[in-house]
Amino acid sequence: MVRALSELGLSDDVKASMTKYKSNNWDLYFDRSRSIYKAQKKDDNDDDLMYFMSPGESTNQLYADYTNKTRVLKKNLMGDDYLLKDTIPKINWKIMHDIRIISGYECRKAIGRINDTVYVVAFYTDEILLRGGPEGFSGLPGMILGLAIPRLNTTWFATKVEAFTNFNNEIQPPTKGKRAETDRELKKLIELFTRYNGNKNEKPEEILKTIYGFVL
């Protein structure tokens, strides 16, 4: 844990604050054009494709189709599972010169920004061609193996990468959950979310950003 945090080049203050949080394992299964990101089952053996460590626990899932640039997010909101479809968000990245080794791969640093003001630090490898990564982050010339959002005191990093041949059944969009696709369904979801969280003064588009936010 300490070694991986130092690899990401985080400040001592950020690393100290991260130690207060609980970490857990996530799996990222992927092929040449698709991926699915989900919390690792507690009874899984240590032979999964890719692990990411991140604070908190979750049973949510994120499926991404990079050919069609679409994704399906299964997210538990107010005690119910919802299926949320949208396009893969575009992030403008600035590629830096810094190099780090993560899980045996040479990774280059990149800096991006989400929600206008939140900076993201990523480390990607061009040895894995899929332009994906944990939490749906994508758009770099290879797989993201390290990710940090200093403002949120949150970090993800790959601890193991392995190749398998028979796992296509794992890379499927989630199907169990309440659908929220039409304008009417989304409006109803926003109203429920507003009542549940008390965000009466927040604009609907900002609430949707929260709903479609992190998979965690």
Predicted regions and their residues:
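Extended soluble regions of mature proteins
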Residues: 1-216
